[in-house]
């Protein structure tokens, strides 16, 4: 639907510093606690990591990895909500999912079959950013044990991640009033137009 563009921020904003290129790739570093980054700092960090996420996810030809950035972003910027290993996360919704997902509804509803959510992830370890998996949820009509969601993921090297459906659904079932979906932090949520 829309190609996302994050605001470009100064490299030193919010305590973020970018080190000199190492091994022909820029190092995306965060000084201090990454939970303390302001919006400009998060944007600068995301912009530093952005191209390498897409390059990694698409290395092995994953179909969703090749197109998810053309979908609707669900937040103004990446954020660290806690799940998925304390990674920065940014979710994109395909055309089928976007209208319903962007309501951030709670209650008795179900996403339409064919909805796909792709969640980018960036880890920070020892002050340095690294690409995490691209987490994918696909709404189907034949997976009642998982609230009709099919869970998958693409590793940073583009290979399919081997995951157990129950590993994902056991956590997502905690969002039972949200059709097993986690939502971005409230302060970064976008809404449907």
Where on the chain are the PLM-derived regions?
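Sec/Tat signal peptide C-region and signal peptidase I cleavage site
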Residues: 18-24
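Extracytoplasmic c-type cytochrome modules immediately beyond a signal peptide or single-pass transmembrane anchor
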Residues: 25-163, 181-193
